[in-house]
């Protein structure tokens, strides 16, 4: 399973990139708004740091405007993937953009059937939201498992991006469920690095070394 980072914070992306684990980035209007910067400027800088799919979301709600925005965003860099919300107008836009050779990531997926429709419309990626489903008492990982099984059964090559990831267990569950990608906040990536026994082991090694050599 590939690891993307879910942020528009350039410094977080730069730090995570240095770990050598990033294969892509997902952004959304809320994340970019937090940065208080021009969207094109932010996306260009992100593309200069990570050589992989960079999801940039349209703001429009009508197909024609989604397509127009998508085409403009795609001009920023060859790695841009256009993020489209799951809705009727969104599916229409995905079909048009796919016919133009522009990759899309259909977001706000909350059911396997939504994922199937998005894939058949031509989406390159679908993004089921784990955390938000958990919030309403529906285990988010269940739909990731169902989508992965359905895509494998029918030979669908659309990639699954586990999104709305809140903790390391979401990442582990996604990997075991067959998700192709998990897009993860920076703080969760850092949590994945840590384990109490790793820290204790490092401390013990240093103590033993210093004791042996009287340091």
From Swiss-Prot:
Annotated Gene Ontology cellular component terms: cytoplasm
A Pfam family of this chain: TAL_FSA
Primary enzyme class: transferase
Localization: Cytoplasm
Keyword RNA-binding included in the entry's annotation: no
Function of the molecule: Transaldolase is important for the balance of metabolites in the pentose-phosphate pathway.
Family under the similarity heading: Belongs to the transaldolase family. Type 3B subfamily.
Name the record gives this protein: Probable transaldolase
Organism whose genome encodes this protein: Clostridium perfringens (strain SM101 / Type A)
Native organism taxonomy: Bacteria, Bacillati, Bacillota, Clostridia, Eubacteriales
